[in-house]
Amino acid sequence: MKDVQRIALLFDFYGPLLTERQQELIRAYYLEDHSLAEIADADGVSRQAVHELIRRSEAALQEYEQRLGFVAEHQRRLRLLDELQEALDRADLSAARRALAALRAEA
């Protein structure tokens, strides 16, 4: 997964845990595709200051994922659902049952 996509996904899950300022910067840089210079000019701070806060915000998102693992669990469930769909498409009922059992085991 590309870094931008990964940060966006982490932000979807853990964004509310960041400070308001961190949320604004992640949103501007990753979701709205503003450059560091554009953000710095709009905020009246240096480009380096914006860069540093974005990096700290990324680190916080990574730390939340490392501790909580919600994104990894979400991706695992999506893979199981894909396996289930493929098994059903092939009419492989035993594989479909295994995938369904794996999903149920989580509930």
Curated annotation (Swiss-Prot):
Belongs to the UPF0122 family. InterPro entries: RNA_pol_sigma_r3/r4-like, UPF0122, UPF0122_fam_protein, WH-like_DNA-bd_sf. Disulfide bonds: none annotated. Might take part in the signal recognition particle (SRP) pathway. This is inferred from the conservation of its genetic proximity to ftsY/ffh. May be a regulatory protein. It comes from the Bacteria. This is UPF0122 protein STH1464. Pfam families: UPF0122. Coiled coil: none annotated.
